[in-house]
């Protein structure tokens, strides 16, 4: 039986491409670079808005998706903040390792030795990419949420957080004592509030987001690091949204004779390495002093019927068979992103976001969300509402009629959405595979929605909006009976 994916792929291949390059007749995206994957071609590469040079090759840039009205269109992915497609170098690394995949550590077989070397080399690559200090270690986890829950088991005291955090950096800290500071209208006043909280009562940790997963606003990490250390606290940066867009140097803010960022957490699946691994980087002493996050093989040096002798970090918190392929993928992503021209990447994303924000300003009834009135920096994330349209209905319309993927809902940040005065929003996020043509298509689709309404009828069932009837292969009304997601 043919799967839905194979059916869609076969149908998409029957569409005559608008442009063809000289390499194997690949489809070229309108207004973007050729999507050919030939080694001597800038395949799957979006070009810099400033220089026109290829930035990076990203899987799926030539994906063609069905439209509800019939036909196919190249997918415009504005959901990078949820999960990013794989960099070509990441899939190459995984494919290279797959034939040698085996259980790591203690295996004498050739494949096991190769896998072990690759796994530990991945740890070194990640440490190098973020400029680890001598007393910091890299622990491989499942994702950012896993990393933060791990650290929450190790903190020897209270943790101070803001009320604008993703749930992953809000909920775990209740185990040892969480103190919530309400963010102010400005970043400057928010820093004053954090300092007042740390002055009033000592805390072990300040846990803060590097960039908001809802609005993309970047917090001043240098000032926050200095503030935490000034009052005897350590700092954790939730870099799930920051790491894919900016290079992070843990020692960049180190005071003379002191330390920089103490702990850093991020996910592979947002870092163009969607193979199920995450990272916690941090100072060894707390990690060594805490009980293991999970008890099991690999986390011990010796076991008797009466007691266990736990290994030091990172092995202490990596019990069980690790995700070798995921670790290798994260390392490949870190190496690839570190080798890119950071300024070119930042300028490219800023150009896209300026174009998107300026365009949204011209669409009647659109309100862009913002936390701080004085924020001057952001990554490639924009959240907005459209008067008269539920966010889920807007997202369904964009997908069904225009082949555009966005995210809608509350983005695992309920307190922040409540603070912003909305029950939900639409989030558009850009990445290395986003083109100017994608942004223009999104803006045109929103203008048509506000001006003319949707061309299709939409119904709400099973926790989501869908076109009725649903004509796209693989997406049937039967799927609407799935349990709704309330995140």
At which residue positions do the language-model features occur?
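Pyridoxal 5′-phosphate
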Residues: 2-487
